[in-house]
């Protein structure tokens, strides 16, 4: 699964996901992409599950680009532990996705296969998505 090699700080603030994506809203590599339509925190496991679903449907033909990276540590307190006594330990890694962000791109497969693969991948994500195609495709 994806996670940073090193980070400046072990734990991060929860924060809020405000506004639309400032960058990463155009297709850069592939012909088809999966675009987020709402703000959400996507975990490393969800990214990996989506990648697997897409590559399996494409039967390892073509190419997949993951345009998001889980760089935010999410901490969690153990079960049945009372409130207080500090922040919990980092449990998993997540990526804050803003609306308009292209999360996955694929190329090298026919349009119908690409759309089916991206629909299967979208089912693994907690975000409402839209399939986008490069103009002239």
From Swiss-Prot:
Keyword terms: Ribonucleoprotein, Ribosomal protein, RNA-binding, rRNA-binding, tRNA-binding
Pfam families for the chain: Ribosomal_L16
Transmembrane as UniProt keyword: no
Taxon lineage: Bacteria, Pseudomonadati, Pseudomonadota, Alphaproteobacteria, Maricaulales
Source domain of life: Bacteria
InterPro entries with a match to the protein in the record: Ribosomal_uL16, Ribosomal_uL16_bact-type, Ribosomal_uL16_CS, Ribosomal_uL16_dom, Ribosomal_uL16_sf
Protein name per Swiss-Prot or TrEMBL: Large ribosomal subunit protein uL16
A Gene Ontology biological process term: translation
Family recorded in the similarity comment: Belongs to the universal ribosomal protein uL16 family.
PROSITE patterns: RIBOSOMAL_L16_1, RIBOSOMAL_L16_2
Molecular function in Gene Ontology: rRNA binding; structural constituent of ribosome; tRNA binding
GO cellular component: cytosolic large ribosomal subunit
Described function: Binds 23S rRNA and is also seen to make contacts with the A and possibly P site tRNAs.
Quaternary structure (record): Part of the 50S ribosomal subunit.
Native species: Maricaulis maris (strain MCS10) (Caulobacter maris)
